[in-house]
């Protein structure tokens, strides 16, 4: 059986949630060889130790705390985790067996359960975020030309090929993880919040020929600490951050890798329609005080994103497609 070690990124702000996660890891039927906690520099290390976990200080950032060489780990696989999930006792063992059976490079747990949203929430997600359900099972999550995604509507318990995935928990073959060079995506950490970091990372594996899959109903609980995302959602600048991140991410992962000029035009039209639609919705919502500045900030974000894609810094980033 493939061996694995655990890599957790954290700021240490939710120690009890982290404790619950560590307890569930130490209780696994197949034990991890190591549990490495990548703690952002300048943040206090939790005072407790559940078992044999080790702490490594790294630069702060959603991407930076994943874009490490993992020199501390010699296992076949790395279980990448946020600090707010917990597992049933045989969860990791089952996913390792899935990885061996399907010869996958990465299997991510479905932690956000889009398919379980209420009908009202599904309609809202489709209208506001262009995120909609799909009724075939070809892909767990499919990325579209406008950089939005669709999700399988009724997966049941199973494991499906995917173009993207949720970021809180994923089992990677170490060779595939290192080959993705997440350090090339550190531009995301320069935003107020690394909006869409999981999408840019998982889709990169898919676009570069890796086999990504998503496991549904395989014994994971999302404890949802929201230490970083909570700050983002409370920020008045979130609309600007979202627009800027979406613009850069679309340009990097959709537009630039497209060799066909006709397809590039269609992708541009698709993305432009999405952004104009979102702007129109924000304009209607701006009658509320909390959304008063949203349209202006959204436009500023698009402009900032377009400006960045023309910068020398952006042009110096290695290509998204690496082969």
Report residues per predicted region.
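Conserved nucleotide-sugar donor-binding
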Residues: 75, 166-181
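A recurrent flexible, glycine/aromatic-enriched loop bordering the glycosyltransferase active site
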Residues: 139-172, 193-194, 229
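Acidic donor-binding loop at a coil-to-helix junction in glycosyltransferase catalytic cores
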Residues: 165-167, 188-203
């Amino acid at each position: 059986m493939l061996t694995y070690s655990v890599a957790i990124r954290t700021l240490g702000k939710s120690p009890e949630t982290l404790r619950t996660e560590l307890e569930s890891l130490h209780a696994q039927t197949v034990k991890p060889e190591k549990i490495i906690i990548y703690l952002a520099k300048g943040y206090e290390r939790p005072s407790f130790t559940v078992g044999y976990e080790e702490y490594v200080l790294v630069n702060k950032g959603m991407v930076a705390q994943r874009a490490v060489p993992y020199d501390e780990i010699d296992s076949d696989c790395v279980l990448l985790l946020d600090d707010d999930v917990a597992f049933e006792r045989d969860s990791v063992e089952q996913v390792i067996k899935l990885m061996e059976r399907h010869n996958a490079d990465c299997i991510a747990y479905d932690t956000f359960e889009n398919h379980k949203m209420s009908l009202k929430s599904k309609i809202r997600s489709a209208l506001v975020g262009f995120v909609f359900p799909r009724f075939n099972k070809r892909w767990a999550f499919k990325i579209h030309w406008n950089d939005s995604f669709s999700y399988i509507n009724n997966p049941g318990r199973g494991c499906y090929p995917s173009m993207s995935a949720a970021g809180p928990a994923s089992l990677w073959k170490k060779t595939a993880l290192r080959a993705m060079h997440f350090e090339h995506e550190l531009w995301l950490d320069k935003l107020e919040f690394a909006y869409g970091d999981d999408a840019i990372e998982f889709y990169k594996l898919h676009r570069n020929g890796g086999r990504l899959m998503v496991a549904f109903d395989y014994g994971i609980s999302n404890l949802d600490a929201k230490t970083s995302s909570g700050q983002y959602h409370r920020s008045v600048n979130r609309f600007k951050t979202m627009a800027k991140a979406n613009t850069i991410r679309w340009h990097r992962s959709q537009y630039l890798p497209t060799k066909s000029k006709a397809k590039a035009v269609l992708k541009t039209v698709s993305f432009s329609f999405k952004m104009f639609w979102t702007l129109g919705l924000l304009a209607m919502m701006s009658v509320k005080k909390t959304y008063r500045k949203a349209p202006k900030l959204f436009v500023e974000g698009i402009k900032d994103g377009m400006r960045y894609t023309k910068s020398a810094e952006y042009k110096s980033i290695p290509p998204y497609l690496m082969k």
